[in-house]
Amino acid sequence: MNLLAIDPKPVVAAQRRRRIEDLEQKMLGLDSGAMTQELLNQTKHHFCEGVYAREFFLPKDHACTGRVHKTACFNILLEGKITLAMGSTEEPQTIEAPQFFVSEAGEKKALYAHEDSVFITFHATEVTDEDKMMDLFTVPTVKAFERYRRELLEDKT
């Protein structure tokens, strides 16, 4: 008999990311366009000497998924209580403000607000154009992130 020891973490993380993407597809099928735009319009952008902070409000009993982050970033739940699902965590976690954590590059999050909540991500950059932030720090899907990583590796060779 041949035995092969493998690390199951990448496989399990990929399965969790797929579940988050499946949730996102179901949410996109709902008629929530007006609400989504209203929430995006409430998003606040803050800049200070090489740091960009994106402040996002999520009302009680609402859920959202985020884009895939290209780099690691700081996260703060400033107000409220949420259930947070990420590809890198074993199971969804319910957390209450104030809470701080780091999410790694390639992370995709799903949030559900048990209370009105304020969530902030922090990124290092000198760019101060709000319209460029989303594409500068995120990609829409895990496949796009994998493509982005391949291109980075190709540029280094």
Located regions from the model:
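Double-stranded beta-helix
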Residues: 114-157
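Short acidic-glycine-tyrosine-enriched beta hairpin
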Residues: 86-110
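A short, N-terminal "cap"/entry segment at the start of jelly-roll beta-barrel domains
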Residues: 1-55, 85, 145-157
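Conserved short histidine dyad/triad with adjacent acidic residue
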Residues: 51-70, 95
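A generic "binding-loop/recognition-motif" signal
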Residues: 62, 70-71, 107, 115
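Structural motif
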Residues: 81, 108, 116-118
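Glycine- and acidic-residue-biased ligand/ion/polar-headgroup-sensing regions
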Residues: 69-88
